[in-house]
Amino acid sequence: MHRLITIGSWALIILLFLQPGIAHKGSVEGIRIFTTALLPYLLPYLVITQLFIRSQNSFLNTTSKFKLYFNIYLLSAIGGFPSGAAVITSLKDLGTLNKSNASWLLAICHAPSPMFVIGFVGIEIFHTQIAGIKLLLIIHAVNLIFLLVFILSSPPIHEKTHIQKLSDSPFQESIKETYQILLLIGTTVIFFTTVSFIVFESVKEIFPNIPSMLLVFVASLFEMTGGISLAGEMLSGSMFLPFIVAVIIAFSGISIHMQIIVLAQKANVPIRKYILFRFLHILIIPILFFLL
């Protein structure tokens, strides 16, 4: 693994020197995506959820595993990824979740923002809001089945003997935690957008007659939104467009995965289950969306 990372790093360094203009263009695009598409939505949501989970209320302070885990899923579903991962890792740091439960929930509570699926994917790509709603319902139906199995098989939650001290300044702590999360997300988005631009342009130069499907694969490998946009352009009118878009969303892109993995490692949450469930998503969700 270390040798592979070393080879990949040297390859990217060489490509950066050979294509500085494209690297700059990719960085600018990454900054644009973060500041215009992610930051305005993520910042208020993260501040509110961080403030919310730091308050002692019955929504999360409960010994009912059904209520606790479903409410965590609800918070994750509203925000979409990587907001859900931020909520789960914060709850792990606060002691609401242990390492095992946080690992399971990180794997299960993985879904794109409803506004993204219904608005961008449904209206802009499929040109019908119903298709976006159907895809979103399939994603959450699959996740909720996994969640129910986890809840039924998980041990009961015991009453805490140690009462966590209330924060003297929950708003200030929420701002501080949000800043750290956004810094991780922003850096990851900009980096992988730059990498995707470099790899995408290099592939087009080396293989000028590359099939459209492979170009879509290259674009979506690193960054989900760019891959979906390209699929909508190159595969417009194709009967396979819904299946391809569902595959891209189920895979989510390396950029999203790295954002979540960085958050998980920061909170010392294992990621093996998360990786396993991403493969299950890729196998299940596109087939259901294509057939239903």
Positions of PLM-derived features:
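Alpha-helical membrane segments and immediately flanking helix-loop junctions
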Residues: S64-F126, F217-Q265
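Hydrophobic faces of alpha-helical transmembrane segments in multi-pass integral membrane proteins
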Residues: S9, P40, P44, I48, ...
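Hydrophobic alpha-helical transmembrane segments of multi-pass small-molecule transporters/permeases
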Residues: W10-I13, G30, F34, V47, ...
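Juxtamembrane/transmembrane-helix boundary motifs in multi-pass membrane proteins
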Residues: M1, H24-I33, L68, S100, ...
